[in-house]
């Protein structure tokens, strides 16, 4: 027996989503369409063969045009010390001011890599699916850099929090999650 789908009010959905903790990332791009970036928590792993991330971007975002036209992104995983930078990239601040607030480098695609992020996933956009107000980007990881993940920044209950390990050795390359 198939259940009938019922409409869920957007505010009820947002309230329930506040119960879902998520890593905080800054997604960046650079290329002929310009340099841009935005704060995102709607990111997850799709598969490790080939390495692919899912990144959601609101089509109303100031970074949208640059991201979709450049067809490259870097997902910069933030640590606790990056909360102010996350707020900057999540606001209405011009792109040049956002990028001036931190040190950046690049990997394979030319998308900006935050110098002291926990990890950076440098990607080419392989596919895009339009859903409601957002595009879901399937991003093929072509390079990555891992700087250490001892105190990552998460967003939960409409607030920033820190999650991490007290012993940096616990954040080594062979974690239980890496094995899945």
UniProtKB/Swiss-Prot annotation:
It is an enzyme of class 1 (oxidoreductase). Pfam families: Flavin_Reduct. It catalyses: FMNH2 + NAD(+) = FMN + NADH + 2 H(+). Catalyzes the reduction of FMN to FMNH2 which is used to reduce pyrimidine by RutA via the Rut pathway. InterPro entries: Flavin_Rdtase-like_dom, NADH-dep_flavin_reductase, RutF, Split_barrel_FMN-bd. It comes from Bradyrhizobium diazoefficiens (strain JCM 10833 / BCRC 13528 / IAM 13628 / NBRC 14792 / USDA 110). Its EC number is 1.5.1.42. The keyword Signal does not apply. GO terms for biological process: nitrogen utilization; pyrimidine nucleobase catabolic process; uracil catabolic process. One of its GO terms (molecular function) is FMN reductase [NAD(P)H] activity. It comes from the Bacteria. The keyword Ubl conjugation does not apply. This is FMN reductase (NADH) RutF. The gene is rutF. Keywords: Flavoprotein, FMN, NAD, Oxidoreductase. Belongs to the non-flavoprotein flavin reductase family. RutF subfamily. Disulfide bonds: none annotated. The lineage of its organism: Bacteria, Pseudomonadati, Pseudomonadota, Alphaproteobacteria, Hyphomicrobiales.
